[in-house]
Amino acid sequence: MIKSIRNLLYRPPAMPKSGEDFGDYQTNFVNAIRFTESCGFLVERPDWKPHERLEVEGSFLEPALRAAGVRDLTKAAFQCLKWSHYLAPHIEQQLGRKVWLTIGQIWKEDQALFSPTWNDLRSWSKQGITIEEMHKPGSAGLNLHAWLTVDSGEVIEPTMMTSIATLYPDTYSHFLCAIGWGQPADILSEHKYFPMAVGAEFAECLHSRSQIGLLASNPQELHSVPMAIVFGN
């Protein structure tokens, strides 16, 4: 009862209004867990291990992708939620450490590339996402970004670089099929991550209540592209 009352009374922190407003990623991540809990989902809290960083060589990736049945990374373009959710348990098993699906905003300098609000996420968790919502003026697809957070405080970015390469092949063809990992500020130059919701359960609820399938349960679904989810505002 007390927890239910706390969730009802919970008010999320202020949204960033510029690239200077992001603060500490780990603090924002814990705030995102608190918001997710207020929506009715259970999320394991992090026991941060900042000194146990991901290896620079990324040798964990190939066996994780192989176990996941990934055969064509170009299909990850514009499919951040589906790919991040699908890859999370495979990467977690390969690393032997906690990995969380993370949903939120991503900015380049002072411009939000994907900018869901707290109200958006809470509403989607209760009612799902409609096709009409994915075709709002000023948007072409699902206005959120998804990635993975590791218990070191680092992130793994499975899709953004391939999306950029697909949009701008003349300039960023070298990004195609690339996966990034490391400190949030180091993944992509001048890009910043703002976590807002955490965990597979939250994503699976969005999927089950939405008018379009958002996730994959097998490699065939992972590699299919029913709808391009591209840059929002």
Per-segment meaning from a language model:
Residues 1-233:
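A structural boundary/capping signal
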